[in-house]
Amino acid sequence: MTAEITLWSDYVSPYAFVAKAWAYQLEADYDVMLTWRPYTLDIAAFQGSVAGRDPHHWRRVRYAYMDARRFANKQGLTLMGPKKIYFARPIQTGMLYAQRHGVFRAYNDLAFDRFWRRAIDPENVAAVEALLLEAGAPAGFPDYLAGEGGVEHDRLRNEAEGSGVFGVPTFVLEGELFWGGDRVGLLRERLDEKGVDRRRAA
């Protein structure tokens, strides 16, 4: 039995970054079709301006990055906190462009790695196109972003929210949501319960 799983992700989320390896491992271990989709967090819209946030908020932010770094360090990853709050629509739409041209895995790895090394501005269209070219995609991303790609990105964001998604990473199996990389264990249990074949022993 093959299971279809949707993974909603955002390149500027530290938790999505560290969950990437767990998602790849899930695909390696189970007979699943894992479809990555961009869910772009508009942080300023739901958390307010930076100036308006209280000390309690910043304590939570500091803890979140400390926690994500624990997982990143275990994977040998570099996770440097971003210098500003981004609305990463360009780099997120790049995911769709990479999928269209068969270079998703290369782009996915590069996009996460470069952002968390502070080596790319996810809002810079030219920088995202250069990343796509490096991954093996053809030129043409700016037009795609300005046209059908941007429309599809926004449609998917609405679709995600309509299905209950509120954060990343979120795995969806037959309508059931598993939010956070630390829920992958529960997702694995659900796959076993449903009789999804394993590609190899756990």
Model regions: which residues?
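C-terminal cap of thioredoxin/glutaredoxin-like
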Residues: 3-6, 12-32, 110-202
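Short amphipathic alpha-helical segments at helix-loop
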Residues: 8, 49-53, 141
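Structural alpha/beta surface segment adjacent to cysteine/selenocysteine redox centers
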Residues: 17-115, 198
